[in-house]
């Protein structure tokens, strides 16, 4: 009899654990975030004006347009926000592994990425441009001029794909940060850098020896940024879209970008 009781208790315990695990796995990301009271956001803080570091109140602080959007999302959810910084090519991987709840880091919702992640409505649209040395603008007038030349891009970015598609005869060098790519250009290691337009403008304004080329880089669509989250995050996605719609209607996203851009220039002169 005791043996049977032990077996029944054992089965009951296994059933309870299985049921608990099933309930946990079936929870939407929104419920998981609200349960823990914190929204963990993956980003790469080297992409001004969307996310970058500056000194505030004596502390190294992550700021930028994406940061403000993430804060607005956390406010809507009624939770705290925690920013987890990493290299850009690890941002989406952290969402996929569950280490981060969302990723907002100038991420384009490509068809390939949409197979693995849920994405919010787009919150910012831009275009991709090519930065060269100012005294070389006359040398590089079309994509063919970069044949057998080196062009730098940020590893894992949509610009990496655009560069490879448009500059197929060039040597595309993938680097961890946009700043590294700019340094390679200034030192003569590469002849061009492919960047998102707002990012390129920031670097050109800070470096009088650089310029945005007139060369047009073709893409299937405009480079549009969205918030990434785990597949099946329907409830969270609805909340994020609500925040994005409100911010866009109020013109706040454009203000975030403008203010962050001004701050990035100010920070670079310190």
Regions found by a protein language model. Name each.
Residues 65, 83-93, 138, 173-183, ...:
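Short helix-initiation/N-cap motifs at beta->coil->alpha
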């Amino acid at each position: 009899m005791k043996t049977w009781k032990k077996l029944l208790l054992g089965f009951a315990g296994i059933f309870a654990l299985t049921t608990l695990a099933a309930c946990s796995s079936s929870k939407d990301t929104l419920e998981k975030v609200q349960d823990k009271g914190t929204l963990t956001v993956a980003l790469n803080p080297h992409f001004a004006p969307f996310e970058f570091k500056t000194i505030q109140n004596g502390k190294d602080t992550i700021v930028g347009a994406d940061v403000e959007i993430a804060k607005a999302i956390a406010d809507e959810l009624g939770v705290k926000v925690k920013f987890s910084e990493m290299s850009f090519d690890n941002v989406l991987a952290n969402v996929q592994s569950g280490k981060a709840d969302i990723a907002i880091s100038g991420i384009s919702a490509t068809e390939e990425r949409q197979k693995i992640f849920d994405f919010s409505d787009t919150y910012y649209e831009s275009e991709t441009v090519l930065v060269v040395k100012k005294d070389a603008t006359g040398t590089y007038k079309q994509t063919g001029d970069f044949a057998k030349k080196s062009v730098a891009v940020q590893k894992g970015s949509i610009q990496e794909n655009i560069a490879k598609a448009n500059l197929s005869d060039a040597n595309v060098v993938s680097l961890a940060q946009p700043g590294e790519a700019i340094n390679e250009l200034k030192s003569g290691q590469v002849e061009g850098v492919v960047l998102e337009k707002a990012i390129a403008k920031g670097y050109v304004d800070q470096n009088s020896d650089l310029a945005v080329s007139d060369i047009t880089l073709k893409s299937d669509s405009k480079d549009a940024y969205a918030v990434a989250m785990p597949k099946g995050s329907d409830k969270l996605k609805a909340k994020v879209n609500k925040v994005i719609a409100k911010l866009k209607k109020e013109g706040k996203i454009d203000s975030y970008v403008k203010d962050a851009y001004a701050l990035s220039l100010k920070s670079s002169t310190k």
